[in-house]
Amino acid sequence: MSRNQIREGALVLADGSVFEGELIGATPASSVASGEVVFNTVLSGYQEVLTDPSYAGQIVTFTYPHIGNYGASTADFESRRPFCRGVVVRDLARRESSYRSEAHLDAMLDKYGIPGIAGIDTRRLTRLLRDTGAMSGAFGSGDFATLAGTAAAEPGTDGVDLVAGVTTADAYTVGSSDPNARHIVAYDFGIKYSIIDHLATLGRVTVVPASTTADEVLALKPAGVFLSNGPGDPAMLDYAVTAIGELVGRVPIFGICLGHQLLSRAIG
């Protein structure tokens, strides 16, 4: 859809708060997009945020007011695609300016089926979320009552295994080809490309699916195991907690973000 064609819409939160704006990106199914509304304070790096699998199931609000000025480039993606439910911005750049840009941000969102809304008071929204915490919300072209009902019915990220939708389907290896190089096994709960790149500077990295068992990991004879970031509720990942618990004490383990929470569950 042309960026010159204005599509009026609104974001309504579960508490009834209304933010009117202009729809951008893809047209949501049934004209309504819903999810857990959160905010991110980065000044640049919006592509990295949008393609971070940790935001699966969430609607990401950017506190910085001007987003999209340098377009979009797949070289800056942190995963194979965006996994967030939606995007909220104050002002979407009408033109991108970068020799690296492959598409306007609006076009990138449309390509991957990610809806968004622009032109709203993100400062007010951020202050509200700061005080209340993440809250379910819905946005689209529907009437306020319909959006409010959808927001109220949105379960958010609790009680859902979001990792299953973002983890790799098959194991793969990157980094050093030296068979004597230090070998790290990285669990992909929603791992970012930049983390894999950093680990690869240390030796050889085998990235494995979230459902990989402890025996399968130990068969790879790793020097250490890395538990990645990822989306959603750690209480829904008993299969990962079981595997991690069986690895504790048998191989060095390091976890960040969701991986840290899962390690905490495994050791009590």
Question: What kind of region is each of these model predictions?
Answer:
Residues 223-224, 229-268:
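Cysteine-nucleophile active-site neighborhood
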Residues 1-220, 234:
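RNA-binding accessory domains that recognize and position tRNA/RNA substrates
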